[in-house]
Amino acid sequence: YDRVGLDETIVVTRSNKRANIFNQGIRNQILYREEELTAGDLLLVAKNNYFWGKDYKEVDFIANGDVARVVRVLKRTDMYGFRFADVQLYFPDLEVEMEVKILLDTLTSESPSLTREQQETLFAQVLADYYDVTTKREKMKRLKTDPWFNALQVKYAYGVTCHKAQGGQWKHVYVDMGYIPQGAVSLDFYRWLYTAFT
């Protein structure tokens, strides 16, 4: 990190579980960050989002794989059985800073984004707030404009899966192959390794 900085260094690994281990290690042992989220943290968007970019002419949508730097953590809230934070993020590739609501639950999740079950729970909980809306169409319209339902799903961006790293470019890339048992090296492994290198 001293040589090329946080923005130009990444660990590419095979699973979200391994990415979480690297992210926690890098945040705690190298960056000395103990809080869950702090200014300066690098985040990776885990799911396309069309809600938060709508007020910015230079942003069509925030794409899965976009990287953002936390400028400020404004407020944390527990709602609908999930943890959220209002944060100010800077997106270097988009060259825009925006205030968004993020889901903290996805930061260390072993799934790529909210699981189907979690997504359904959030959907049902937010939809319940619109009990007074009589038509299904109007409820769906409200849901599309609800900041809680449309919270940005993010992960830490220090260690990521090969899938999430695709299309990115860094000066220093560390490829973690993890433990490879005897005989586990297959064509699939070599394909993954090729993708990681390219």
Where do the protein language model's features map onto the residues?
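Conserved interdomain hinge at the start of the Helicase C-terminal
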Residues: 1-7
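Core RecA-like ATPase module of SF1/SF2 helicases and allied nucleic-acid translocases
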Residues: 7-198
